[in-house]
Amino acid sequence: YGDSPPYSQLFQKWAQKHLQNQFFPITTFLGRKDYINLINRMDIVVMYHNRQQAFGNIITSLSLGKPVFLKPNNPIYPMLKAMGVPNIYDINKIGNLNIKEICESAAKKREQCIVALKKYYSEQARLEYLVNLLK
């Protein structure tokens, strides 16, 4: 998001130093298949935004059974929690959690994520919303 070369370069430099081989910056457009493959190779997804951003990426990650860590002040966090979507975690608690256990548990909860998300984000949910809107 955004195209601020100084910030991007500064962040990439920091991440390479601190995260080393666990950091893979995406600097060019990836096709859908390549992007899905990239997410599938991730253990966890961290979205450290203060505002609503990357919603499609979050939904895709959850649909693939990935645990997603968000800031609790991000409006997406309480919304997904209220929807009953598992695999949403408070980024502020990441240091107190067993990431290996979370990853194993998240894969098992993938279907639950999909079911919870489809209640709100599916063709059927859209049609029901439109019918109610037009009543």
Predicted ranges, named:
Residues 67-70:
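Short hydrophobic beta-strand element within catalytic cores of glycosyltransferases
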Residues 51-55:
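Short glycine/acidic-rich beta->alpha loop that forms part of the nucleotide-sugar donor binding site
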Residues 37-50:
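Acidic donor-binding loop of glycosyltransferase active sites
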Residues 36, 56-64, 77:
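Short alpha-helical segment that forms part of, or immediately flanks, the ligand-binding pocket
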Residues 73-74, 78-84:
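Short acidic/histidine- and often glycine-rich active-site loop of Leloir-type glycosyltransferases
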Residues 97-135:
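A charged, aromatic-enriched C-terminal amphipathic alpha-helix characteristic of glycosyltransferases
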Residues 10-29:
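Nucleotide-activated donor-binding/catalytic signature segment of Leloir-type glycosyltransferases, i.e.
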Residues 25-38, 74:
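Conserved active-site histidine-acidic residue motif and adjacent donor-binding/catalytic loop
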